From Swiss-Prot:
NADPH binds at residues 228, 230-231, 251, 269, 353, 355, 398, 400. NAD(P)H oxidoreductase. Involved in the ubiquinone biosynthetic pathway. The keyword Cell division does not apply. Disruption phenotype: Lethality during third-instar larvae stage due to a decreased number of ubiquinone species. Its main location: mitochondrion. Residues 31-40 have a biased composition (Polar residues). InterPro entries: ADH-like_N, GroES-like_sf, NAD(P)-bd_dom_sf, PKS_ER, RTN4I1, YIM1/Zinc_Alcohol_DH_Fams. It is found in: Mitochondrion matrix. This is NAD(P)H oxidoreductase RTN4IP1, mitochondrial.
Amino acid sequence: MTAAGFNSILCLRQLVRLNRRQYSAPAKSVLSGSQTNDQATPPPTSKSADKMRGWQLHNYGDIDELQLSEMLKIPQIRCSNECLVRIRATAVNPIDLAMLRGYGATVLNKMRCQPGDGIEFPLILGREFCGELVQTGMGVSLPLGSRVWGVVPLQATIGSHAEYVAVPSYCLAPAPKELDDYEAASVLYAGLTAWSGLYITGGLGGPCGATTASGGGAHKRVLVLGGSGGVGTLAIQILKSQKVQVLATCSENAIEMVRNLGADLVVDYNNPQAMEELCKYAPYDIVLDCAGQGGQKAAESKYDFRQYITFSSPLLANIDKQGLGVGALKNVFDLFQTNVRSVTQRGGLVKWGFFSPAPQGIQFLQKLVEQRKLMPLIDSSYGFSELPKAFEKMKSGHLRGKIVVKLREETGD
């Protein structure tokens, strides 16, 4: 990121912080006292204290299916590596909107094989958070009271759109001091999606890039489609931190913002003449589709590439529509057919990228934040009682960064 771009992002950050203060109402404390040991014993001491607020889903459908419940049971730790977190801030991601409509239900229900996880409803959405560690299993070394950031596995029935969440210890880490609660709650889901696509699926840094926090990819050339969204903005910063040449597409009114993130060339995807410029830099080592175009569009590109990685795969949708067996076969056929066209016309492979809650990915992102090479962009912020409005904002599209939701006041730790 350039110095001028970094200063511009800092100015935007200050404006967002000023605008969000009206939503910062403290939530009630439901834990009495503090726990000094690391064993998973029930934290509350009264019947009223073991309850929490959360947004539940009892049927798949539209945003009006979300219901705020005031007396939900706080999740219990069931394994030695689990952690209970009191949430201060969370975020709304495209996957939340998709899961609200039933996306991935067939596969995710099969994955809910632990006792108590096999029930589909009620479902609490939310994939990432920043909060306070209030209880741990005996195998967790993080101290209680730690400020942490983390993600929630997709198959979990209790997500982060509630006051408390329980997750495996590999899904969280100490939150960077460089970020406030809002910012820390907005990094990991999109950041791990971008990191996984580039380093696990794309092999950008070789074997070490996928298995460690080393990163890599210097002097490669990557085209980011949809550079102004949650995944795109973080992908650009990740790539530039590793000395990768980055080109990006976005709408005309987001060009300056994306350029400030460090992209070497930014073009308006609605301008055919500008899009022609991308052909001059081909072939690309990776085309990273953060715009939801899907692999079918790869062969229609006017530029060559070695890999086209899309986060909009039909994998879960095919299984939802046709069942596990037939859907799996349909996935194999779709990927094969897409790659035949892609290799024939553009010379490269199409791959599907996915979110991965890998601890080495969290460590990599944490390192970039601490080095001030990665800063999340906040599109808008909402209070917890306004979560449906946050979903409406997500549904409207054309975001400039992430949508965040605040549950608690910051404590300055």
